[in-house]
Amino acid sequence: MSKSKIGEDVYKKVDKVNAELFVLTYGSIVAQLCKDMNYEKVNEELDKMGYNIGIRLIEDFLAKTEWPRCADFRETGETVAKVGFKVFLNFSPIISSVSDDGNTFVLTLDDNPLAEFVELPADARQKLWYSNILCGVIRGALEMLQMDVDAVFLRDILRGDEHTEIRVHLKRILKEEIPPGDE
């Protein structure tokens, strides 16, 4: 069964939150952060929030999908795009620009549900990555799978780009360490 089909099947089975409520709530959080701090700090805060979500979301993902360990980082990218995004956000970005060494890929989002109903103020267009929470979620989830990654936005429709793109780069595979006394 294809990854896209598995993502679709799992999405149909899980409890859902009203998409508009989710998008509007996220927008309210970002708006409040923008009032409280500068855009660079907002980007950091959204990434941190996403990271904390990602380290918990991966457990839910694995429980719902019973997904086996991926053979390589490219397969991980395809799983994130075709299954992970589909299960939790009901869309599947396109994976592209896979590096020759297989340690980097780009996720292209034609539709970003977080960006619905959003128009950035002119002063935010060069500094704010509105959906930066997604980078944090990817980073947190993959870290729980022993992958230390960078996830950064390259382009954003809200900044006037044609597509939204996130580059994910594998820095290193983390070693599983057993806590002292748990041998």
Curated annotation (Swiss-Prot):
GO biological process: endoplasmic reticulum to Golgi vesicle-mediated transport; intra-Golgi vesicle-mediated transport; intracellular protein transport; macroautophagy
Localization annotation: Cytoplasm; Golgi apparatus, cis-Golgi network; Endoplasmic reticulum
Record-level GO cellular component terms: cis-Golgi network membrane; cytosol; endoplasmic reticulum; nucleus; TRAPP complex; TRAPPI protein complex; TRAPPII protein complex; TRAPPIII protein complex
Chief location category: cytoplasm
Listed Pfam families: TRAPP
Lipid attachment residues per UniProt (S-palmitoyl cysteine): C70
Lipoprotein found in the keyword field: yes
Gene3D superfamilies on file: Trafficking protein particle complex subunit 3 (3.30.1380.20)
This protein's UniProt keywords: Cytoplasm, Endoplasmic reticulum, ER-Golgi transport, Golgi apparatus, Lipoprotein, Palmitate, Transport
UniProt similarity note: Belongs to the TRAPP small subunits family. BET3 subfamily.
Protein name: Transport protein particle subunit bet3
Species this protein is from: Schizosaccharomyces pombe (strain 972 / ATCC 24843)
